[in-house]
Amino acid sequence: MKALVVYDPKSKFTLEALKAVEYKLAELENLELVYVADHNHERMENPKEYNLKMEKEGPEWITPEPEVMEQIKDADILMTSFCGVTRAMLEAGKNLKLVFMMRSGWENCNVKAAKELGIPVCNCPSRLAEPVADLTVAMMICECRGILRGNRDILNGEWNQNDIYNDTTNAALCNLRI
Protein backbone atom coordinates (compact mmCIF):
# COMPACT_ATOMS: atom_id res chain seq x y z
CA MET A 1 0.00 0.00 0.00
CA LYS A 2 1.36 3.42 -0.97
CA ALA A 3 0.69 6.67 0.88
CA LEU A 4 1.62 9.83 -0.97
CA VAL A 5 2.55 12.58 1.49
CA VAL A 6 2.46 16.02 -0.13
CA TYR A 7 4.12 18.46 2.24
CA ASP A 8 4.88 22.16 2.37
CA PRO A 9 8.66 22.60 2.05
CA LYS A 10 8.46 25.93 3.91
CA SER A 11 6.85 24.30 6.94
CA LYS A 12 9.10 21.87 8.74
CA PHE A 13 6.29 20.93 11.12
CA THR A 14 4.34 18.60 8.82
CA LEU A 15 7.38 16.76 7.53
CA GLU A 16 9.04 16.49 10.96
CA ALA A 17 5.80 15.31 12.58
CA LEU A 18 5.34 12.59 9.97
CA LYS A 19 8.97 11.52 10.12
CA ALA A 20 8.61 11.22 13.91
CA VAL A 21 5.76 8.69 13.58
CA GLU A 22 6.87 7.10 10.32
CA TYR A 23 7.87 3.87 12.07
CA LYS A 24 4.31 3.53 13.42
CA LEU A 25 2.75 4.22 10.03
CA ALA A 26 5.06 1.66 8.41
CA GLU A 27 3.50 -1.05 10.59
CA LEU A 28 0.20 -0.60 8.73
CA GLU A 29 0.04 -3.28 6.05
CA ASN A 30 3.54 -2.56 4.76
CA LEU A 31 2.64 1.03 4.08
CA GLU A 32 5.15 2.71 1.78
CA LEU A 33 5.41 6.45 2.41
CA VAL A 34 6.40 8.61 -0.55
CA TYR A 35 7.16 12.27 0.20
CA VAL A 36 6.70 14.98 -2.43
CA ALA A 37 7.18 18.70 -1.82
CA ASP A 38 4.37 20.99 -2.93
CA HIS A 39 5.77 24.18 -4.43
CA ASN A 40 2.46 25.68 -5.62
CA HIS A 41 2.28 28.19 -2.81
CA GLU A 42 5.75 29.44 -3.69
CA ARG A 43 4.30 30.77 -6.94
CA MET A 44 2.40 33.24 -4.85
CA GLU A 45 4.34 36.21 -3.56
CA ASN A 46 2.47 36.06 -0.29
CA PRO A 47 1.48 32.75 1.37
CA LYS A 48 -1.25 34.65 3.24
CA GLU A 49 -2.86 35.55 -0.11
CA TYR A 50 -2.62 31.89 -1.16
CA ASN A 51 -4.44 30.76 1.99
CA LEU A 52 -7.13 33.42 1.65
CA LYS A 53 -7.72 32.53 -1.99
CA MET A 54 -7.87 28.82 -1.11
CA GLU A 55 -10.46 29.52 1.60
CA LYS A 56 -12.61 31.61 -0.76
CA GLU A 57 -12.28 29.68 -4.02
CA GLY A 58 -11.19 26.17 -3.11
CA PRO A 59 -8.30 24.35 -4.81
CA GLU A 60 -9.36 24.27 -8.47
CA TRP A 61 -7.43 27.45 -9.38
CA ILE A 62 -4.05 25.80 -8.78
CA THR A 63 -2.10 23.61 -11.17
CA PRO A 64 -0.99 20.40 -9.44
CA GLU A 65 2.73 19.70 -9.31
CA PRO A 66 3.87 17.31 -12.07
CA GLU A 67 5.60 15.06 -9.53
CA VAL A 68 2.41 14.88 -7.45
CA MET A 69 0.41 13.94 -10.56
CA GLU A 70 2.94 11.22 -11.36
CA GLN A 71 3.12 9.77 -7.84
CA ILE A 72 -0.64 9.87 -7.21
CA LYS A 73 -1.32 7.46 -10.09
CA ASP A 74 -0.63 4.39 -7.95
CA ALA A 75 -1.18 5.86 -4.47
CA ASP A 76 -3.74 4.31 -2.15
CA ILE A 77 -3.75 7.19 0.33
CA LEU A 78 -3.13 10.91 -0.17
CA MET A 79 -1.94 12.80 2.91
CA THR A 80 -1.57 16.57 2.78
CA SER A 81 -1.81 19.71 4.83
CA PHE A 82 -1.66 22.84 2.67
CA CYS A 83 -1.53 21.35 -0.83
CA GLY A 84 -4.68 21.92 -2.84
CA VAL A 85 -6.39 18.65 -3.78
CA THR A 86 -8.02 19.20 -7.16
CA ARG A 87 -10.43 17.10 -9.20
CA ALA A 88 -7.57 16.37 -11.63
CA MET A 89 -5.48 14.93 -8.79
CA LEU A 90 -8.35 12.80 -7.53
CA GLU A 91 -9.12 11.50 -11.01
CA ALA A 92 -5.44 10.69 -11.61
CA GLY A 93 -5.36 8.67 -8.38
CA LYS A 94 -7.04 5.56 -9.78
CA ASN A 95 -6.21 3.54 -6.62
CA LEU A 96 -7.08 6.23 -4.06
CA LYS A 97 -8.97 4.85 -1.09
CA LEU A 98 -8.60 7.83 1.25
CA VAL A 99 -7.62 11.50 1.29
CA PHE A 100 -6.32 12.57 4.69
CA MET A 101 -6.16 16.29 5.39
CA MET A 102 -3.64 16.89 8.17
CA ARG A 103 -5.47 20.03 9.25
CA SER A 104 -8.75 20.96 10.85
CA GLY A 105 -10.44 22.32 7.71
CA TRP A 106 -11.48 21.05 4.27
CA GLU A 107 -11.03 24.22 2.25
CA ASN A 108 -8.05 23.01 0.22
CA CYS A 109 -9.75 19.82 -0.98
CA ASN A 110 -12.40 19.41 -3.66
CA VAL A 111 -14.63 17.36 -1.38
CA LYS A 112 -17.46 17.35 -3.93
CA ALA A 113 -15.23 15.66 -6.53
CA ALA A 114 -13.93 13.19 -3.95
CA LYS A 115 -17.50 12.26 -3.03
CA GLU A 116 -18.45 11.82 -6.69
CA LEU A 117 -15.44 9.53 -7.14
CA GLY A 118 -16.23 7.56 -3.97
CA ILE A 119 -13.06 8.62 -2.15
CA PRO A 120 -13.53 9.35 1.56
CA VAL A 121 -11.91 12.53 2.89
CA CYS A 122 -11.02 12.89 6.55
CA ASN A 123 -9.41 15.68 8.53
CA CYS A 124 -8.17 16.43 12.07
CA PRO A 125 -10.96 18.50 13.64
CA SER A 126 -9.42 18.34 17.12
CA ARG A 127 -5.94 19.29 15.92
CA LEU A 128 -6.24 22.77 17.41
CA ALA A 129 -8.21 21.84 20.55
CA GLU A 130 -5.29 22.13 22.96
CA PRO A 131 -3.91 25.46 21.67
CA VAL A 132 -7.43 26.92 21.62
CA ALA A 133 -7.95 25.82 25.23
CA ASP A 134 -4.58 27.35 26.19
CA LEU A 135 -5.51 30.64 24.54
CA THR A 136 -8.92 30.66 26.23
CA VAL A 137 -7.39 30.25 29.69
CA ALA A 138 -4.75 32.89 28.93
CA MET A 139 -7.43 35.34 27.78
CA MET A 140 -9.49 34.68 30.92
CA ILE A 141 -6.46 35.46 33.09
CA CYS A 142 -5.77 38.61 31.04
CA GLU A 143 -9.36 39.76 31.53
CA CYS A 144 -9.51 38.94 35.24
CA ARG A 145 -6.26 40.78 35.94
CA GLY A 146 -6.86 43.66 33.51
CA ILE A 147 -3.61 42.93 31.69
CA LEU A 148 -4.67 44.29 28.29
CA ARG A 149 -6.23 47.44 29.76
CA GLY A 150 -3.14 47.98 31.91
CA ASN A 151 -0.86 47.47 28.92
CA ARG A 152 -2.90 49.94 26.87
CA ASP A 153 -2.73 52.52 29.68
CA ILE A 154 1.04 52.14 30.09
CA LEU A 155 1.57 52.47 26.32
CA ASN A 156 -0.50 55.68 26.46
CA GLY A 157 1.71 57.02 29.27
CA GLU A 158 -0.95 56.50 31.95
CA TRP A 159 -0.91 54.51 35.14
CA ASN A 160 -4.09 54.08 37.11
CA GLN A 161 -2.91 53.53 40.67
CA ASN A 162 -6.48 52.76 41.74
CA ASP A 163 -6.68 49.83 39.32
CA ILE A 164 -8.79 47.17 41.05
CA TYR A 165 -7.49 44.49 38.68
CA ASN A 166 -4.00 44.66 40.12
CA ASP A 167 -5.09 45.02 43.74
CA THR A 168 -4.02 41.64 45.13
CA THR A 169 -6.34 41.94 48.13
CA ASN A 170 -9.32 42.52 45.85
CA ALA A 171 -8.23 39.70 43.56
CA ALA A 172 -7.95 37.31 46.50
CA LEU A 173 -11.31 38.30 47.98
CA CYS A 174 -13.43 38.85 44.88
CA ASN A 175 -14.54 35.24 44.50
CA LEU A 176 -15.30 34.53 48.14
CA ARG A 177 -18.87 34.11 49.35
CA ILE A 178 -20.24 35.02 52.75
Regions found by a protein language model. Name each.
Residues 69-72, 90-93, 173:
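A short, aliphatic-rich alpha-helical micro-motif
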